[in-house]
Curated annotation (Swiss-Prot):
Signal peptide: none annotated. Involved in the production of dextran, an extracellular glucan polymer. Its EC number is 2.4.1.5. The keyword Glycosyltransferase applies. This is Dextransucrase 2. It is an enzyme of class 2 (transferase). The gene is dsrF. The keyword Glycosyltransferase applies. The dextran produced by Leuconostoc mesenteroides CMG713 has a molecular mass of about 2000 kDa and contains exclusively alpha-(1->6) glycosidic linkages in the main chain. Belongs to the glycosyl hydrolase 70 family.
Length: 5
C-alpha cells in the first residue's frame, strides 16, 4: 500500500 500527501 502507498499513501501520498
Amino acid at each position: 500500500d502507498s499513501t501520498n500527501y
